[in-house]
Amino acid sequence: MIENNKEITLDIIKLLPKAELHRHLDGSIRISTLLELAKEQNVELPTYDQNELAKLIHKDENCSGLVNFLEAFQYTCSVLQHAYAITRVFYEMCEDAVADGVSYLEIRFSPVLHTSFGLSLSEVMEAVCDGMAIAELNLPIKARIIVCGLRHLDPSISKDLAEITWRYRHKGAIAFDLAGPEDGFSSKHHKEAFSIIRNKGINCTLHSGEDSNWTSVADSIHHCGAHRIGHGIAIQQNEELLNHVVNRRIPIECCITSNYQIKAISNASEHPIRKYFDSGAIVSICCDNCTMSNITLSGEYKLAIDTFNFKVEEVIRLIDYSFASSFIDPPLKINIRRESFKKALKIFQTNGYDISGVIENKFYYFEEIGLDVELEIQNNLANNFSLGKNVIRNYPQITLELLENLPKSDLHCRFDGGVSIEQIWNEVQLLGIDKCEKSKQEFLKKLSSKHLACYANFKDFKEFKSLIQSSSHTPQTIRLSKEIINLLLQTPEQINRAFDDIIKVALKDKVQYLELMIRPNSHSRNGLTKEQVLALIIENKDKWEKSSSIKIGLVVFSSSTSDDPIETLDSARLAIANRNSGVIGFGIFGADPISPTESRHFSQTFSLLKENNFNLVQFAGKSDVESLISTIHCSGSTRLSGAFQSHKIPRLMSYLGNYSIPVEISLTEKLKSFTSDDLSFTTPIRHLLDGKCPVVICSFRSSLYPYSRSKMYYKIVKNAKLDFKQVVRLLKNPFAYNFQSHQQRIELVQQFNKLSKEYLNSVNINYSNIII
């Protein structure tokens, strides 16, 4: 019998599959093992009575604060100076975790704390790797290792530990952490360590906002590239930072009991986990130090459930958040998530709990782990190879008509490159350039060089179209076309007409969401200031959003070719100043990306964007991989444009996929030119898709090409041999990976689903298990 509001008991919680992401080796040793090892190694302890020793080690009663909490580590570390002891404790931690229902465990420790008796860092690492291997051979658990640097030690030590993390990446070391006191020991001091971490694409989590303020967390994210935040209590001090963590999907490792015991909060109910969860943040319930806190992960779930009134569906989501936030490889992660979800749901269902909330939130589970909750319940939550059961066997043929009628989003439409050829010709006619040779020559004098004017031979619309949309564009003709279009977009009237044309064409292409890229400096030849240009664009955006179904985001951009660092900084300030008027990001584009050596000249711009948690998209990876790495980690880009060379390093492609870093791409001459080596066995777009990179197809400068968005998609689909399911994913990506807030992205994806189903139903196309 199903009971509403039935108590979620500790026994039930123990049965649930769980992942633990924040557990310290030297803080989770059994008291009995501590005693045995001390006797074996002749280590002096204050007492050898197990009960009395437990009173010293456990901090669940009368802990006066962090200093008192840390005192116990002197005893645990003293017996962990020999390889066999380290191996044993790692194994026993896994054993204890399994007894508590934990099926995935990340154990963190600092190897440097285990070298007092002569072990090298490598010997310490071999010892934990042995413990992990033995555990996985004998226990139903997956375990991994996180190596900790220490803030208060010399940065050179952290550098060595970062290097050892990289060297043991294939033996189970999956991430680097920075632990230790925050105040007075900024993570910025350890830049050499994080340079290694970033350049090698190593996962990264930092203890931040535990015993310090929100700036420590901001430093961890913006300067160190943290993929997760350990503790993060201080995030609540800054709403803008919290929104950034939510929107960037940066998980927070929440250690409720530990935070209470060190007096970071006065009681468990003051922990911000519920606030974070309700704000849309990804939170993971963790133990920190099981022995010192005298807790289990099941107990921490029980504490959170009872204190913050988490319901069945929320508990299942908390469980999934932890598995989703793990640093394990993506193919294994997604399958662990699916099986853990099914197991948890079945436990609640068979024990009489109301699971209607899970069905109500089926959108989350379908989009996140690809499971149709209702279908899984119908199939009795089969655990073995159930994914794909009842899925369409015969996908519909992908036709141009199908693509024309499905909803789309475009995340990179250039204002001076997205105007239709008809509207551009209209501006030519309004200036009389088509009728008067003198007017034409006066117009062409405004081009940047006389050499370019030599190519501008057109007498009528047909010749003009052949010039602007040449089937054999060269760098010269592309440059000429861009300059001609730009010269025709200099007055308020021209800007207004161009905006109207761009939106009308987008609506015709069934575009529901558009990110319009605008470089205000490009439209100031006739005396308009960049502020006036942007004000015109914002006014037009507001007008169209009120009068039509389209939603528009504005991205101010700078040219790495034409703008110097001072002009780029000025444009970034303009973008941020208008963030409440629809400007949602900043971009840097050009003929060539900013190289790693040049990026320091733009450091003020990058720092400003980071300080304001402002989205950045940047052109990178044209002909080198280095610019991709510096663009992600030094510039702080949340989206990449181009990324033509990412396929050369499979680990980099995996990184883009694992951290959902979207790649803007289109059928441009640049794509063909800089990915020619990739075409021998696949297409560049298919290569990125198969690597699980969130590819977003964009129109860029559609004025230069004679096909609509739908025709561009059709070419891509045919060249890459995509099936219906892959096409749906490709179309959905820009709805899910744009610069809007997390909640708005959810709403956009739901809009895509709704409109897609309406059309597919009208033509009797089955979309089971593809769209929900």
From Swiss-Prot:
Keywords of the record: Hydrolase, Metal-binding, Nucleotide metabolism, Zinc
Catalytic activities: adenosine + H2O + H(+) = inosine + NH4(+)
The protein's Enzyme Commission number: 3.5.4.4
Binding annotation for substrate: H24, D26, G180
UniProt cross-references to Pfam families, sorted A to Z: A_deaminase
Enzyme class at the top of the EC tree: hydrolase
InterPro entries the record matches: A_deaminase_dom, Ado/ade_deaminase, Metal_Hydrolase
Protein name from the UniProt record: Probable adenosine deaminase
Protein species of origin: Dictyostelium discoideum
